[in-house]
């Protein structure tokens, strides 16, 4: 919906929302009033006042009465219009909570001001008014390069009279600026004298180009913000999250600490910055960001890996030279004092006055997807928003290490606003995915002129994203193996190239580009062709990553067999071979005694005859998903009724994007059994099922380097294959170390051979990265250091005998009468009379769970087993949605165990399932 904002009245600082239907009614009433007024004027023109007679005077009285009636009608219509306008105003006020001015921020402004830390060599006062045409022309002529396009000829001149001006600081090229020195020369010269600038000073300042926030080579990028040292200062920052957008001079309602956000939700709040000292404090920059990162800790290596996959900057909340209107559309007047006596906004002077509080409002909208550059391997599933997972116990000197899960509540926190929420999500202490609202003040040390963090504050958020396509149980093992095979082929190709040049080294022969890459993109076989080795290797990696972009289409449409060209369902299969002696008396279980049939007795031909066959079990991977499960306190706080209007509309919009089949939660699995009896076996009834049990398997994998391939449950749960994979890449890792050492020892000789036949070409350096790039090295280290943790949970689902549906006795009797007569029916009747409860349970178990064997054709039977998946309401664990990121992943499986009578064995199958947040 597109909202049209009126530029007229702005009550409480919010623009009114225009309602089309109500406005049309008002215009219609106004049109009717104008028509009546025009008709009244026409009537008056037909009764002129000149030449009135007594009869005319009577008509005049009638006209007066008519006019008064018209006035009353007009007043009545005005009341109706006013009432409609008031209704329109009330409807506008009711929709203010949903109002959002969704405007794309200026990339130039972000690139110039927030992408790096400004160094302040521009006087902020000069940004208040635009320069004159003469100043712009003078500045342009100064900045423009000369005819030879040399930037070095544009020089900086120190401002006369500056105490900090150095003799050798009067000539610096624009490309070699030192912003810290330049800014002091400029700002100090304009303020040290304590007087207004002369005309000569104006001329000198106008010649200084505005390199602040523009010259990327001289500024400190925001990525280095996290490596700056922290300084202890008397500055305090407090972050508050509110339920709705804050309105100046009104106290907002704060959000609950247990609040969970999802994709598309809006996060409102404000920051309080207070200088508690008696002296003013200068700062360089103030940032308010929404950030998310993954933390992986390797205790053996003593290594902590952080991958920041999300950083959103609120331009209106962070410091800037001007006041940016917030996206909420609220009219905020900088410099005013709010209800808590805090000054709204920060001054251009970048100074915090003593014992003064400042306030900055912020608003963030959670994205539905990350940027493509988030994953270098271009895995689409890695570019989806992952859920909050564990907590970072090692952050801020182990500030959150003391958080424990309350056994009653099922979660734990510090008890203060902004604390992370710890649940039993089965994430170890060395792995976490965190979302925070961060506020940082960057300052500068007066003695060393180096930047530092004067104060920082964070507010932890709990995010459970909406389930978009990408992470699904439908992705099969073929995709994983294909990507793994392509990666291994590339690594083997690089090793072969290294072996070639080492052989050339032994033979003292010249090294060509064909030896390095075994290819020539120029289309010729000239070994002296000047090729960029890094470019060739980059293209090979790009080609490898292009295949990663192609996700499995199994979740969208059935896969096809390349030979038969027929659709093949995404199935999980297993089989069991059985063999047992045929006896007159069968040692069956209690249920089989209850439900034995006449075929069992008739098939017993002799005590020494063996019955054998094969049972095949197949389950189709379900498209439905299990619901995200959290502690009851979190579920109660985040129920649909407790959400804001914007969050309700956002959730309904997201749910409307999903197909109907995905919206339905997974409540059962249809297991198909096929019994194929041996030809040399006597005819017999297939083995009966004695029990059906379920388990919930949790698979968590992590690595301290970016994972290059897409994982699947089949690979991660196969211990033998996983160990072979790790062993192979550990061997690759060892080879890389040996090759690197040998290359460095013979670096000079290798470069001599590489440039031997390059007489007419510029000499080039041969590097080890031309063979094994940093990306390939990362891929090897990632799979070599892969760690997988598998947890079996036995109490997630209810037992099958506790999932029976209640049926009427008539229905049960009809179903029971439809069964073929049994030779042991008298025994069953006796048992039913004796153990009525057991008979009822056995009947329901057969009718609702295991059903009966059906003969399809000679020596072949089929059976459908319904495995109910009803969650236990007393689950202590938290089942977070499936996730797959560059450093970690979480998958789930439902393990179904079917046990047969007479100790014939059991069948076990692991069905991959998804856990998604589809219900509130």
From Swiss-Prot:
* Motif mapping: PY-motif: 129-133
**Which residues are modified to Phosphothreonine?**
22
Q: Which residues lie in Polar residues bias regions?
A: 1-10, 35-57
* UniProt-annotated stretches for the region Disordered: 1-89
Fetch the InterPro entries from UniProt: Bul1-like, Bul1_C, Bul1_N
Main role? Component of a RSP5 ubiquitin ligase complex which specifies polyubiquitination and intracellular trafficking of the general amino acid permease GAP1 as well as other permeases such as PMA1. The RSP5-BUL1/2 complex is also necessary for the heat-shock element (HSE)-mediated gene expression, nitrogen starvation GLN3-dependent transcription and pressure-induced differential regulation of the 2 tryptophan permeases TAT1 and TAT2.
Lineage at the top is: Eukaryota, Fungi, Dikarya, Ascomycota, Saccharomycotina
User: Gene symbol?
Assistant: BUL2
Identify this protein by name: Ubiquitin ligase-binding protein BUL2
Q: What PANTHER family does the entry give?
A: BYPASS OF STOP CODON PROTEIN 5-RELATED (PTHR31904:SF1)
Q: What is its main location?
A: cytoplasm
Which pathway or pathways does this protein act in? Protein modification; protein ubiquitination
GO annotation, biological process = positive regulation of ubiquitin-dependent endocytosis; protein monoubiquitination; protein polyubiquitination; ubiquitin-dependent protein catabolic process via the multivesicular body sorting pathway
């Amino acid at each position: 919906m597109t909202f049209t904002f009126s530029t007229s009245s702005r009550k409480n600082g919010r623009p009114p929302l225009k309602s089309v239907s109500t406005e049309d009614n008002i215009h219609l009433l106004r049109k009717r009033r104008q028509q009546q007024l025009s008709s009244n004027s026409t009537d008056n023109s037909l009764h002129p006042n000149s030449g009135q007679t007594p009869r005319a005077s009577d008509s005049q009285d009638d006209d007066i009465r008519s006019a008064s009636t018209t006035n009353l009608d007009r007043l009545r219509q005005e009341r109706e219009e006013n009432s409609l306008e008031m209704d329109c105003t009330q409807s506008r006020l009711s929709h203010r909570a949903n109002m959002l001015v969704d405007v794309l921020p200026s990339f130039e402004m972000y690139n110039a001001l927030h992408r790096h830390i400004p160094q302040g060599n521009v006087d902020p006062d000069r940004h208040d008014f635009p320069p004159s045409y003469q100043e712009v022309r003078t500045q342009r002529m100064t900045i423009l390069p000369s005819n030879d396009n040399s930037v070095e000829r544009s020089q900086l001149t120190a401002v006369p009279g500056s105490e900090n001006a150095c003799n050798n600081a009067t000539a610096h090229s624009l490309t070699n600026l030192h912003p810290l020195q330049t800014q002091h020369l400029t700002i100090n010269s304009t303020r040290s004298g304590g007087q207004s600038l002369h005309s000569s000073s104006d001329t000198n300042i106008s010649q200084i180009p505005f390199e602040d926030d523009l010259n990327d080579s001289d500024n400190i990028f925001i990525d280095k913000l996290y490596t700056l040292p922290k300084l202890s200062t008397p500055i305090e920052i407090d972050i508050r999250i509110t339920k709705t957008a804050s309105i100046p001079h009104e106290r907002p309602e704060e959000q609950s600490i247990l609040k969970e956000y999802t994709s598309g939700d809006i996060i409102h709040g404000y920051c309080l910055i207070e200088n508690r000292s008696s002296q003013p404090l200068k700062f360089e920059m103030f940032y308010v960001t929404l950030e998310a990162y993954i933390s992986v800790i390797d205790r053996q290596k003593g290594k902590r890996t952080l991958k920041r996959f999300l950083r959103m900057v609120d331009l209106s909340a962070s410091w800037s030279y001007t006041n940016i209107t917030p996206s909420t559309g609220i009219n905020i007047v900088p410099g005013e004092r709010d209800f808590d006596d805090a000054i709204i906004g920060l001054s251009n002077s970048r100074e915090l006055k003593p014992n003064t509080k400042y306030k900055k409002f912020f608003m963030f909208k959670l994205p539905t997807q990350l940027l493509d550059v988030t994953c270098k391997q271009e895995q689409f599933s890695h570019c989806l928003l992952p859920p909050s997972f564990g907590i970072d116990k090692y952050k801020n000197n182990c500030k959150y290490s003391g958080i424990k899960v309350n056994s009653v509540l099922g979660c734990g926190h510090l008890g203060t606003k902004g604390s992370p929420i710890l649940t039993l999500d089965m994430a170890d202490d060395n792995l976490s995915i965190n979302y925070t609202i961060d506020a940082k003040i960057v300052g500068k040390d007066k003695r060393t002129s180096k930047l530092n963090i004067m104060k920082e504050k964070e507010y932890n958020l709990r995010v459970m994203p909406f389930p978009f396509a990408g992470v699904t149980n439908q992705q099969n093992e073929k995709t994983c193996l294909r990507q793994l095979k392509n990666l291994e082929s590339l690594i083997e190709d690089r090793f072969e190239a290294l072996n070639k040049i080492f052989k050339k080294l032994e033979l003292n022969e010249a090294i060509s580009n064909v030896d390095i890459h075994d290819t020539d993109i120029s289309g010729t076989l000239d070994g002296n062709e000047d090729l960029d080795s890094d470019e060739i290797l980059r293209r090979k990696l790009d080609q490898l990553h292009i295949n990663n972009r192609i996700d499995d289409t199994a979740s969208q449409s059935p896969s096809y067999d390349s030979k038969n060209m027929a659709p093949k369902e995404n199935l999980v299969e297993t089989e069991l071979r059985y063999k047992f002696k045929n006896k007159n008396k069968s040692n069956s279980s209690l249920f089989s005694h209850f439900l034995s049939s006449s075929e069992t007795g008739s098939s017993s031909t002799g005590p020494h005859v063996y019955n054998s066959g094969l049972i095949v079990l197949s389950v189709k991977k379900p498209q439905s998903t299990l619901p995200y499960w959290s502690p009851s306190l979190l579920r109660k706080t985040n129920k649909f009724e407790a959400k804001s209007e914007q969050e309700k509309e956002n959730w309904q919009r997201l749910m409307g994007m999903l197909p109907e089949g995905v919206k339905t939660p997974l409540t059962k699995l249809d297991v198909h059994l096929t019994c194929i009896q041996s030809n040399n076996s006597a005819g017999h009834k297939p083995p009966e099922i004695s029990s059906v049990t379920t388990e919930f398997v949790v698979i968590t994998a992590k690595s301290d380097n970016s994972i290059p391939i897409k994982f699947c449950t089949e690979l991660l749960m196969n211990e033998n294959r996983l160990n072979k994979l790790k062993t192979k890449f550990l061997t690759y890792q060892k080879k890389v170390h040996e090759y690197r050492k040998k290359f460095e020892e013979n670096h000079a000789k290798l470069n001599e051979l590489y440039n031997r036949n390059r007489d007419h070409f510029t000499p080039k350096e041969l590097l080890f990265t031309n063979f094994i790039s940093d990306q390939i090295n990362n891929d090897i280290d990632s799979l070599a250091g892969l760690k997988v943790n598998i947890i079996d949970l036995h109490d997630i689902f209810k037992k099958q005998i506790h999932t029976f549906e209640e049926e009427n006795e008539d229905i049960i009797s009809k179903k029971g009468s439809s069964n073929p007569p049994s030779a042991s029916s008298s025994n069953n009747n006796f048992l039913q009379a004796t153990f009525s409860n057991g008979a009822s349970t056995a009947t329901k178990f057969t009718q609702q769970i295991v059903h009966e064997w059906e003969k399809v054709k000679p020596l072949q039977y089929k059976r459908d087993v319904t495995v109910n998946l009803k969650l236990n309401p007393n689950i202590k664990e938290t089942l977070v949605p499936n996730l797959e990121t560059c450093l970690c992943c979480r998958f789930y499986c439902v393990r179904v165990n079917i046990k047969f009578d007479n100790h014939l064995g059991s069948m076990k199958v692991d069905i991959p399932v998804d856990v998604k947040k589809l219900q509130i």
